Amino acid sequence: MKALTLTLAATFASIAIVGLTAAQSIPSLEKKPLELGNFSVSLAVKDIKASKAFYENLGFKEVAGKLEQRWIVLQNGNARIGLFQGMFEKNIMTFNPGWTTDKQTLPDFQDVRELQHILKQRGIKFTTEADESTKGPASFLIADPDGNTLLFDQHVPSPKR
């Protein structure tokens, strides 16, 4: 039994080493890092006033939005969340290319259309797409394998590259 266990362990180790070597030699797996920009979580809430009070008790401060329009953005250090009442059904992870955590425009960044192009090449399926013939603000949506929505939402002019 011990010999069988050792043989199986050696076989799996060989498979893992061969798989790793093969994967490293495939150019499509060598991925350029993406500059996704500022990250926040957009929460679909039922009662924006109750949600705002809850997050303020956690130390978050309102930094943007309009409560009367049922959306606000709260921040605590580098953590940023958006509260949205009646605007979408599920929570969304949001990336803002070109923005710092305090909504300052970066001098150089990957435009949302460049990110979209790279993700298409990697086989990512899109829920909505940015118009690649335009410049400036644009957005697209994708979903991860579990159905979580990711929004890539550029609010600033395209960088001059």
Language model features: what each stretch is:
Residues 71, 80, 92, 139-141:
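Short hydrophobic/aromatic beta-strand element in the GNAT-like acyltransferase core
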Residues 12, 17-49, 155-161:
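N-terminal beta-strand motif that seeds the catalytic metal site of vicinal oxygen chelate
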Residues 46-49, 87-88, 95-149:
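Vicinal oxygen chelate
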Residues 1-9:
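Bacterial N-terminal signal peptides that target proteins for export
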Residues 35, 42-87:
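Core segments of cupin and vicinal oxygen chelate
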Residues 40, 92-94:
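Structural preference for beta-strand elements that scaffold enzyme active sites
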Residues 65, 84-87, 132-134, 152-159:
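Short beta->alpha transition motifs characteristic of CBS
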